[in-house]
C-alpha cells in the first residue's frame, strides 16, 4: 500500500528520502478513520503539548528546555490527596487494578472506570495473566511508606508524565480516569504490607 510516497509493508514504514507526509495530511487521515460514538468523541484525536512532542518523528530535533518545562508543568499540576491521607483500602484497590472497563464507546460513563493495571504490570505474584510493558510491581511495599515515597507513587498514578514525559501509562488522576478514593485504594494495593502484591507465592 502506498500513502503519499510511503511504502507500508506489514506495519513497517519505508519512506523515501525525497517524500514527506504533511502533518495536515496525517490529521485528515486520522479524522476520516474515526467516528464519534458515545463517550469516544473526536476530541480524543486532539493532542496536548506533551503528546505532540512525544509523537515527533524519530530523529527530529528536540529542545531539552521544552521537555524540561513540560515535565515541570505536569509536576506542578499534580493534586495531592485533599486530606493528606495517601492510602485507602487495598481490597478495593485490587478490584480497581483488575478492572479493565471504562472510557470505551460501549462502556457506561456513569459507572466507575477500572485501572487495568494488570495489562502492563505484574502485581500479585499468584496472578498469571499480566502484561510486561511496564515493570513488575510485585513487592512494591519494600520501598517503604516515607512521605517522599508516598508522594512519588501518587504522582506516578496521577500523571506519570511528571517523571517520564513520553510514558504510555495512563494519567489516571490528571485525566479524571480514577477518582481520588480509587487512587488511594490502588496506593494501598501497592504499599500495604498485607496486600497480595507484597506476599510471596
Q: What role is predicted for each listed range?
A:
Residues 81-82, 106, 172-175:
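Generic anion/oxyanion-binding catalytic loop in active/binding sites
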Residues 14-103, 156, 189-201:
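Post-cleavage N-terminal segment of exported redox proteins
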Residues 106-115:
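Local sequence-structure signature of Cys/Sec-based thiol-disulfide redox active-site neighborhoods
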Amino acid at each position: 500500500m502506498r500513502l503519499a510516497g510511503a511504502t507500508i509493508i506489514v506495519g513497517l514504514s519505508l519512506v523515501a528520502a525525497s517524500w514527506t507526509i504533511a502533518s495536515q495530511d496525517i490529521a485528515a487521515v486520522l479524522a476520516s478513520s474515526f467516528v464519534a460514538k458515545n463517550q469516544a468523541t473526536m476530541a480524543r484525536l486532539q493532542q496536548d503539548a506533551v503528546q505532540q512532542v512525544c509523537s515527533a518523528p524519530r530523529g527530529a530535533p528536540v529542545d531539552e528546555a521544552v521537555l524540561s518545562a513540560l515535565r515541570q508543568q505536569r509536576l506542578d499540576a499534580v493534586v495531592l490527596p485533599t486530606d493528606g491521607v495517601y492510602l485507602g483500602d487495598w481490597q478495593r484497590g485490587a478490584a480497581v487494578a483488575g478492572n479493565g472497563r471504562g472510557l470505551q464507546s460501549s462502556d457506561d460513563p456513569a459507572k466507575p472506570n477500572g485501572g487495568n493495571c494488570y495489562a502492563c504490570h505484574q502485581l500479585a505474584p499468584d496472578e498469571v495473566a499480566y502484561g510486561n510493558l511496564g515493570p513488575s510491581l510485585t513487592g512494591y511495599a519494600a520501598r517503604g511508606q516515607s512521605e517522599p515515597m508516598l508522594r512519588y507513587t501518587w504522582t506516578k498514578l496521577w500523571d506519570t508524565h511528571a517523571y517520564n514525559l513520553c510514558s504510555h501509562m495512563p494519567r489516571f488522576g490528571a485525566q479524571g480516569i480514577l477518582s481520588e478514593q480509587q487512587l488511594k485504594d490502588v496506593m494501598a494495593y501497592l504499599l500495604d504490607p498485607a496486600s497480595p502484591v507484597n506476599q510471596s507465592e
